[in-house]
Amino acid sequence: MKHFEANFDGLVGPTHNYAGLSFGNVASFSNASAVSDPKSAAKQGLKKAKALADMGMVQGMLAPQERPDLHTLRRIGFSGTDAEILNKAAKEAPALLRACCSASSMWTANAATVSPSADTQDGKLHFTPANLVDKLHRSIEPVTTGNILAATFNNSRHFSHHQHLPEHSSFGDEGAANHTRLCENYGNAGVELFVYGQEATNPNAPKPQKYPARQTLEASQAIARLHGLSEENTVYLSQNPDVIDQGVFHNDVIAVGNQNVLFYHQQAFLDTQNKFDEIQQKFGDSKVHFIEVPTAKVSIEDAVKSYLFNTQIITLPSGEMAIIAPTNCQENPAVFAYLNELVTLGTPIKQVNYFDVKQSMQNGGGPACLRLRVAMNDMELAAVNQNTLMNDALFTRLNAWVDKHYRDRLSVDDLADPQLIIESRTALDELTQIMKLGSVYQFQK
């Protein structure tokens, strides 16, 4: 049996826009109200996904959310025709309309937490959609996310799907952006790292003062229980609250791991050495490569601006590891110098590949945000909805679909355009047929 890690990237939706919705996310906030290019954004994401497939990686795509989300606008009291609802919301509650048009589901690192069958008690691959309760615009995603995941991983013999955690701040859960799995080989039992920003039930525990901590210890522990993980293969690490206050809203902005490598910034965690000792002890006899980036070489500001740690580390078919980085890392002198040095240090990371994902970066997410990691074996891969897996035919078809349905310019004011509803629903209805997803959206019910 073969084992590997698949990446399922979020397909950028037709309403990709810069509304500046995410307090604590420096890039999102600083680009608020800029004019976006949904067509370019979608094509940049598809190009990155296809490039990884061409490298020999298993690569899938996850469908975007339905936006504008008129179902939520109706839930909060707006009524009338679709056009009337948009018009009323734009006039009476523009911030709520922007939230209901969010493009953030493209960042599937926040879609769910995934535990592979090698780690779980029942030997199934487990998925729990993130509840994303800290941000209104993301808190409306989990039900549809669950539908899309169930339509993608649609075999109960191999996959177990859980409901998202209770919608309360005590269980704030941001998905795989705060979860890393280390292992010797993808088919071996690994060590699952859950990184949290605060303890909801302990008012005396450290927490940030300026920006919110979006992941709680209690949420991480609940997911470990749901997924049937043992104490022997879980480690809980506290994020450094000071770096959260400097714009590190998720752990994947300050650390990233793959197999026996944890690549992290010097200031990423609290109680670092004790926690790393625990990781190594639970990992076993093989060595974990803890690759620390010193503050003296890369500041927190440069790490956040460039998204040095919001890169993907992948294991190529050759066995070498490579970093998939945004071109922003090339454009930052300190970060580019560090990455050039990194590949000479004798670690498992041997190369860096750069991709232009600026439309995503300007909205606050880099290459790692765009993908959900799923370690699996070939039997499980055969049980996945094959129409969601990247190949030449799907790449061609999805690019043609984007050309047909997406605008190349979208401002925040355009979100009130009733035509956008028709365009978006027409596109998504066709997409569910391309990817054979069935009726996953509210408008299809």
Curated annotation (Swiss-Prot):
Substrate binds at residues 19-28, 110, 137-138, 214, 252, 363. GO terms for molecular function: N-succinylarginine dihydrolase activity. Pathway: Amino-acid degradation; L-arginine degradation via AST pathway; L-glutamate and succinate from L-arginine: step 2/5. The active site is at E174, H250, C369. It is an enzyme of class 3 (hydrolase). One of its GO terms (biological process) is arginine catabolic process to glutamate. Keywords: Arginine metabolism, Hydrolase. Pfam families: AstB. Its EC number is 3.5.3.23. It catalyses: N(2)-succinyl-L-arginine + 2 H2O + 2 H(+) = N(2)-succinyl-L-ornithine + 2 NH4(+) + CO2. Signal peptide: none annotated. Disulfide bonds: none annotated. Belongs to the succinylarginine dihydrolase family. Catalyzes the hydrolysis of N(2)-succinylarginine into N(2)-succinylornithine, ammonia and CO(2). Homodimer. This is N-succinylarginine dihydrolase. It comes from Shewanella woodyi (strain ATCC 51908 / MS32). The gene is astB.
